[in-house]
Amino acid sequence: MSSYNSFSLWILFSLQLCFILDSADRTVSLCQPDCGGIKIPYPFGMGKGCYLEKWYEITCNTSTSGKLVPYLSVINKEVVGISLPTEGRGSRYNNPYQSVNIKNPIASKECSSNGEELGSLLNLTGTPFYVSQHNELVAVGCNNTASLTNVKPSIVQCTSSCSTKPHTHIKDYLAVLNCQNYNGYEKNCNEDSSMDESIMDETSCNGIGCCNAYMRGGSIQQIVGVTIENTITRGCKVAFLTNKAEYLSNKSDPQKLHARGYSTVELGWFIHTTNHSFIKSLGCYSVKEYNNERYTSTQRRINITSCICDDNAYLSYARCSCTRGFQGNPYRLGGCKDINECKEEEGMTYCGTNKCVNLQGHFKCVYNNHRPLAIGLGASFGSLIFVVGIYLLYKFIKKQRKLNQKKKFFKRNGGLLLQQQLISTVGMVEKTIVFSSRELEKATENFSSNRILGQGGQGTVYKGMLVDGRIVAVKKSKVVDEDKLEEFINEVVILSQINHRNIVKLLGCCLETKVPVLVYEFIPNGNLFEHLHDEFDENIMATWNIRLRIAIDIAGALSYLHSSASSPIYHRDVKSTNIMLDEKYRAKVSDFGTSRTVTVDHTHLTTVVSGTVGYMDPEYFQSSQFTDKSDVYSFGVVLVELITGEKSISFLRSQENRTLATYFILAMKENKLFDIIDARIRDGCMLSQVTATAKVARKCLNLKGRKRPSMREVSMELDSIRMPCGDMQLQECVSENEEGEEQNKGLVEDIMRAESRSKEFVTAPASHYNNIAAASSSSWSDVEPLFPLQTR
């Protein structure tokens, strides 16, 4: 009977044990593997029965934003990652690498408006966790001195400054910056001896606004604090311990780091237990057993176990890791799995072109006959070199042809003559820049259509940006007259000498293209015509003072061209579309495509008639003799445009008043100046100034050139008008001197007949006029011929 009872008890005990083991396996399999996307490997776990001991318990909480966040319960810190020891981390068997990354508050000073100062202390006493040596002390802010506490005998400290030279102090009981510290006594050292100023950049943390110091020594630190010393320097300062120091630099903002509030700290961990039954249940070798078996075995390369454990009974902790050739979780029975080294991962192969055979915890390579492969590779490589050589030869020949073509164009376009001219003018004028075609192609995106500012009958203007950041206008002609290249080069040299704030500057040219290309400074605010007639920006032209200033700027520029430049220059196409407005709405005279230079002993040029209807001097139209007074007449028309806001040619006016000059002269003669003043300025202008300006315009529009004032006189008179003066009666604005009107009647009739036949632009006798309507609305980028017409 007793034997029967004993047998029954034994069966009952066996069934109970099986039930317990089955329940344990089932519980582990039902454990939640992650929290908020962060994997939770054993011995850590969430829920009862899912973690080894209370130290490794993870709670999965819900944040205010609704996301799941894991916390390490024993220290109540948010977890951002848990790692297990792996062979690939380069760890030694007696010190396997395993860590927990947590969020830890940072220390700050003078970063909040209420003056609150925050400290940072991490206390891990009594837990199986310690502060990893992979962490660094980081201090950010000007003249910020930070240090770690509770790390004796070491002194870990650094100082950041905002001077031009770094002063980073890292004190350690080992060796930092050639310093040695033994038992608290510090030797003299040169702090700069190990500094490399070449690494002082914005991507490193080397003492300029940011410094760092490494934790050193082999002792396990479980209480670490961060303090910031008091300094006289004001401003936000932060300091913290982190394993992510590589993401900080001298440009790091302490205020942003303070607002973030935390840093990532790496903690090392081990199995905290005095009962080693768990370690033994894993079936792992101890380090001593592993070394003895491995180095006494005849097959030393083959691992005899998948995991090893460092079981230190004296310190009451143990750490395990998978051996070489295995990977996985060493804290689970059979958790270390064989690595298939023969499987290509990330492009890495162990045997190269040979056959790879996977073994348990190892692999071997079966070598092949490489001769056929070598022959094939040699043939392929030779063919590749041949093809590449042919391609490079083709590219070289193509480049040489292009270079020779550029040289040919440069010589044909007068490049040698330009070089001689530049040599002869050294020290006298600013050197003209000769741009390469490659520079201009890059500046205009290979003359992209998206860069076009405007097009005309003779060429196109592109907007470009040079390598130095300057914005320029690149003028590319469509045609070239090789007979006039010498004259063109002379014009380029002379125009490049012009240095006046109210004249668009010619920056240089390019002669390596089929036709020469001119480069001008870029004027951003369009031309005067757009602002006066197209309501481009009505507010700018709504005041008389702006218009008077523009008139004075134009007069000063033309006066400079006629009398102040090294050789007098006649513009020959003064009109509102050729008056540019810069960013301050100051006038700049542009488009010298038809300009002519004259010697000081000549008073006029005899040329083929060229100009724009409505602005052209009637006397020049009949005689083909262009003088400085011809520019005066054209300026007079622009002056009337500023006063009246009317276009130089308008089909909305009567036949006899179709040209603005005739319309204005008749209004002055009938004493109706007030009626033709632009309505936008009529109420707010000084009538005395408008009247005086109208008198100047009337003088400029005299049909006889000898009775017109010079541009210098016009400029001086407009300057005097701008001076404060009393109001004048409107009737005084009408000039009583109409001398020569009857004698010039025949001239006026000829002009009127020419206008009835014309369409826009005169480049030949009157029978070749083009469209007038197009002339009255053309933009500033209307391109005139790059090469001046032949003088006679």
Curated annotation (Swiss-Prot):
It comes from Arabidopsis thaliana (Mouse-ear cress). Its main location: membrane. The keyword Transmembrane helix applies. Residues 307-365 are annotated as: Atypical EGF-like. The chain crosses the membrane at residues 373-393. Residues 24-372 are extracellular. The active site is at residue 573. Serine/threonine-protein kinase that may function as a signaling receptor of extracellular matrix component. It is an enzyme of class 2 (transferase). Keywords: ATP-binding, Disulfide bond, Glycoprotein, Kinase, Membrane, Nucleotide-binding, Phosphoprotein, Serine/threonine-protein kinase, Signal, Transferase, Transmembrane, Transmembrane helix. InterPro entries: EGF_Ca-bd_CS, Kinase-like_dom_sf, Prot_kinase_dom, Ser/Thr_kinase_AS, WAK, WAK-like, WAK_GUB. This is Wall-associated receptor kinase-like 9. PANTHER family: WALL-ASSOCIATED RECEPTOR KINASE-LIKE 10-RELATED, WALL-ASSOCIATED RECEPTOR KINASE-LIKE 21. It catalyses: L-seryl-[protein] + ATP = O-phospho-L-seryl-[protein] + ADP + H(+); L-threonyl-[protein] + ATP = O-phospho-L-threonyl-[protein] + ADP + H(+). PROSITE patterns: EGF_CA, PROTEIN_KINASE_DOM, PROTEIN_KINASE_ST. The modification Phosphotyrosine is found at residues 520, 620. It is found in: Membrane. Residues 394-792 are cytoplasmic. The EGF-like region is specific to this family of proteins and seems to consist of the C-terminal of an EGF-like domain fused to the N-terminal of another one. Residues 1-23 form the signal peptide. ATP binds at residues 453-461, 475. SMART domains: S_TKc. GO terms for biological process: cell surface receptor signaling pathway.
